[in-house]
């Protein structure tokens, strides 16, 4: 097995461990917020460590030459999906007027969105494409895995699987983590408020009694 394939399997294993631990901390221990913070620190550290290699930043989408194309594609996704989610939520009496937490989510969620896109697209997507030798297989498997992470919430599972398939397809064609981080963060914020009718910051406020 080549060094590239070994690294691909190693990184996919790390992602699988992250997903399993997320399921345990969220469903069994009810410590979702602390786990997310720990996951952000771990993957940020791994990203910084690997960026020492020449050309790695470009390979992972930390680049400017794909910015315009990625922005255009993700902009269309954001407008269409965002409008659909807001329209759905308003028809259900959600988010009118928008809760204050929405603005905080729109400001902060892109940070977590960038980390998730790094894991989903740069790590899982590119490594699956390397392992399978097929973009279609990589997208199908990646979307299924990302959706499964959000079980037992089937609504969130389906939403995230569809979103992952679109994001991964766009990233493998126009890799740009900066654009994908904001796209993920803003769409996820709208999904929580207008589709799921949930406030993901409630757990944080409860943890700190604010």
Q: What does each of the following model-derived ranges do?
A:
Residues 16-24, 81-90, 143-152, 185-196:
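Aromatic-anchored segments of alpha-helical transmembrane domains
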Residues 29-39, 97-102, 154-161:
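Short, aromatic-rich membrane-interface segments at the entry and exit
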Residues 26-28, 57-63, 89-101, 201-208:
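Membrane-interface helix termini and inter-helical loops of multi-pass transporters
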